[in-house]
Amino acid sequence: AKVIRSGKVSPADPQAQEIHGSPPARVDGIVTTGDVVRVGPLRLTAFATPGHTEGSTSWYWKSCEGTDCRTITYVDSITALPLGTYRFADHPDRVAMFRKTIAEVAALECGILLTPHPAASAMFERMSGARPLEEPGSCKALADSAARRLDAALGKGADK
């Protein structure tokens, strides 16, 4: 909420050297893991997924068409993206935060998985019908990919 209120990127953000902030915005409330936000008939449950940013928040909810109900899970970006001179190897607390988030996402039964970067979860292929909309193990696959990217980011930092 601090970044949204101020519009200033946290210097601890791995992308801080490349992101130049945004206009400040009013924050009406803060959600934490387990909080439920109602949007019309939907009840969205928040869960923290820090890593890509410290305040990353993901959501899950049940959506029904008649008696056909599905769980939908939006997982915010869990990609380790160091920009500029940022080295994950120099920030063990951030690495631990990422690893905890990745493990939590891997354990989820996502139902229909949504991500902010469609390629991370084959969203376009699933929405077009080229792949099943709901794929068992989709959260584990997303987490495994994120773990590989984090390991690669750590490897890049180790040789400098």
Language model features with spans:
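Residue-level preference for alpha-helix termini and adjacent loops
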Residues: K2-V3, I30, V36, S77, ...
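Metallo-beta-lactamase
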Residues: A1-A48, T53-E54, P82, R87-G111
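Conserved beta-strand hairpin/beta-sheet module of binuclear metal-dependent hydrolase folds
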Residues: S58-L81
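Accessory terminal helices/loops
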Residues: G66-D68, A80-K160
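Active-site neighborhood of phospho(di)ester-bond hydrolases with catalytic His/Asp-centered motifs
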Residues: A48-P50, Y74-D76, I112-P118
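Generic hydrophobic alpha-helical membrane-span motif
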Residues: T57-S58, M123
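Residue-level signal for well-ordered alpha-helical positions
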Residues: S6-V9, K62, R126
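Short active-site segment of divalent metal-dependent hydrolases/proteases
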Residues: E54-G55, A120
